[in-house]
Amino acid sequence: KADDLFRRLEIYVFGDPRYEGIYTDMLSKTYGCLRYVNKYRTVAVDFVKKYPFASFMDERHIDRSSALVKDGVEINAVFIGFGKTNRQIFLTSVANNQFITEGADGIEIKQVKYHIFDKNAAENNKNLNHTYYRFRTEMKNADKSEYLPMPQLPAQEFYHQTDINEVKFYDEIEKIVTAGANDVNFIVIAFGNDFENIDLAHKLIEKRREWGANVNIFVKIRREYDGISLFDGKECYVIGNESKCVYDIHTLKGSVLYNMARMRDEIYALEYMVTSEGRVPSEEDIERCRKDTYKAWFRDKLPLERESNLYCCLSLRSKLNMMGLDYCKKEEQGEALSEEEYAAIYAKDFPIDKSSYDRDVEGKKIIRYDLNFLPSLRTNLAVQEHLRWNSYMISKGMIPATIEQIKNEKDEKGKPTKGKNYRLRRHGNITTQEGLVKFRKIVARITSKSEEECDVIKYDYQIMDDAFWLLDKNGYKIVRK
């Protein structure tokens, strides 16, 4: 069959982001044999995967028992240059480097402060206005009574229209990175060619030493310079090597994030057979499910949905880091935690219920969720996951649906949309935890189902509840950081 052939055929297209819509339309008609690669997004994902901000934070900054950022800690990210690379790194970072802290009304986002330096007025950008800033602009004057509780803005941005040759350039950066003794600071350099970026990186390394500041420096270098040692040790991290993270076919084909995202999509379809249909999947069921979910991944899911699944897996390492853990390949150094040891850290105050179903699917125990989400590290990370998802959706230009749309909107087939309308770029779940409880009550009424059946909060638990299984199946282990 043609779709089976397409499943074995992979064609990678490295296209200009300006024409991404053309490739996206073609991709949906080829069952996944055509893969569009946006090099700027690939560089950004590689950066966030290798260097999540949480990996540079320790007990001075995060309470490992709760994953909450401590009082008196600020997280600052300085972007030097705001062209295609740094703009995409900013959006990918906003969608993944999300932290939580204790606020007046419970857990809330600990906003990262992004300081953007560019010689041009970088805040005036049609792409950002169409995507990331849509939520801020359109919701600012909206009647809040028509919506579920509004989520926070994902981050704070400060724009500095400054040339690197101006005297105030270093002065302004020094003020940012020396403001607090417990602050965590990041500088991402991507304003010019390789040599310009390298030169500024060396100057900032010297300045960091003079300032006595805690600053992690990253520099974009596109090419590999064989035999040349550009930096000593970890004084500066090189990002954006296109031959390794963009144009290497083995990296593209073997993407662990893609594999994990696809595996999660498949396993939850199989679990549905057990939890909703009450039957044990046969080998034929499993193979058919693999084919069906593979086709649906490319044919039915929008790029927004596929990337959402990918970013969920991308956030896994950051969440582990918040607990003082990490993951690495099984053959690498570091003593692996057992599943029991992982659960004792992650879920000791709110155990995972794996006993309600007497069978597993593909080696993964099926987890039972009710509506009793207890205060715990496990729950905090689920809250963080929803706040991260909110931020991802906002970064893509999505806005909340109104309560009226959640209650009454129907699609072309007459089915309730529950406020989810990708064509009009809105979603009923872009809200707070309180809003998600109200959402399930509304949906339970309009569908005549129980609240437990209509709950969506449980989905925010899944990535960490299933982390051990997911990493193990992909050749990785969980270790202490």
Model-inferred region functions:
Residues 417-427, 431, 435:
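Basic/Trp-rich segment in TM-proximal cytosolic loops or flexible interdomain/linker regions
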Residues 1-288, 292-392, 397-414, 432-472, ...:
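Cytosolic regulatory regions of ion transport systems
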